[in-house]
Amino acid sequence: MSESGSCLCGSVNLEYKSEPNFFLLCHCTDCQKATGSPVASIIGIPENDFIISGEVNSYKCEAGVIRSFCINCGSQIYSTAEGAPGLILIKTGVLDKQPSIDPTMVCWTDSKPNWLEIKHPDIKFEKNPG
């Protein structure tokens, strides 16, 4: 298996080979502000399996998450988090093919908009479970 993706303008490309460790839907206010969307769709893969080409810039937020984005088009590509050492957190919107697994966790549901329905109630957390 080899999966790939790119930013909106095509300047940044990524590739990985392993199955995702998890598939997370995050409703925290930081993810909402960073993505401009009510939810961030994220997969976690081992850092040593991540290949990226092209130039990114990064922003570190107070929560200890470093968000990396294309310097040309601004597409969020991936993040790293102090609480998840050794993992790359890829935004699934940049992938050429969406993950074939179901979400494994839906977190920060207390921050989601009221009009957004959670389809996976058995894996939802009002805050971050970690």
PLM feature spans:
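A short Gly-Trp-Pro
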Residues: M1-G130
